[in-house]
């Protein structure tokens, strides 16, 4: 009986843990609410990734959100004031529920862009 229990214990310890990472997935969505479809990642995909791109000029703005599984973790971000892009990654169950948190608006650059737009429009009327 002890030999059987020892064999079962050895088998359990030697078996690799099953890959069960599940991430939210979407492509080019305009809202985070459209990105709530869970998918099971492939064995080599160990990270959930969220890619965010946002643009705002004057009173018009737009954004694109993509989510999914990835074998690498490419966290990065850039903020140019009127445009921003970021990639956020994590590695736990449904961890990419939110949009990327690394993008922050630069209100000074946005205000400067709006001011330059107004000056351009006013000069175009002359």
From Swiss-Prot:
Residues 21-98 form the UPAR/Ly6 domain. Residues 99-126 form a propeptide. Disulfide bonds join 23-48, 26-35, 41-69, 73-89, 90-95. GO terms for cellular component: cell surface; membrane; plasma membrane; side of membrane. The keyword Repeat does not apply. Glycans are attached at residue 96. The keyword Signal applies. It comes from the Eukaryota. Expressed by thymic blast cells. It is a lipid-anchor; GPI-anchor. A lipid is attached at residue 98 (GPI-anchor amidated serine). InterPro entries: Ly-6/neurotoxin-like_GPI-ap (IPR051110), LY6_UPA_recep-like (IPR016054), Snake_toxin-like_sf (IPR045860), Toxin/TOLIP (IPR035076). Residues 1-20 form the signal peptide. Coiled coil: none annotated. Its main location: membrane. It is found in: Cell membrane. It holds the Pfam family Toxin_TOLIP. Keywords: Cell membrane, Disulfide bond, Glycoprotein, GPI-anchor, Lipoprotein, Membrane, Signal. GO terms for biological process: lymphoid progenitor cell differentiation. PANTHER family: LYMPHOCYTE ANTIGEN 6 COMPLEX, LOCUS E-RELATED, UPAR/LY6 DOMAIN-CONTAINING PROTEIN. This is Lymphocyte antigen 6E. It comes from Gallus gallus (Chicken). The gene is LY6E.
């Amino acid at each position: 009986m002890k030999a059987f229990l020892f064999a079962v214990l050895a088998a359990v310890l030697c078996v690799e843990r099953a890959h069960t990472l599940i991430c939210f997935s979407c492509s080019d969505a305009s809202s985070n609410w459209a990105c709530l479809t869970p998918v099971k990642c492939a064995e080599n995909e160990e990270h959930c990734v969220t890619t965010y791109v946002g643009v705002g000029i004057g009173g018009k703005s737009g954004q694109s959100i993509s989510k999914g599984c990835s074998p690498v973790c490419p966290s990065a971000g850039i903020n140019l004031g009127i445009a921003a892009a970021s990639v956020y990654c994590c590695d736990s169950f449904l961890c990419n529920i939110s949009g990327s948190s690394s993008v922050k608006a630069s209100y000074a650059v946005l205000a400067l862009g709006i001011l330059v737009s107004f000056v351009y429009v006013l000069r175009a009327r002359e």
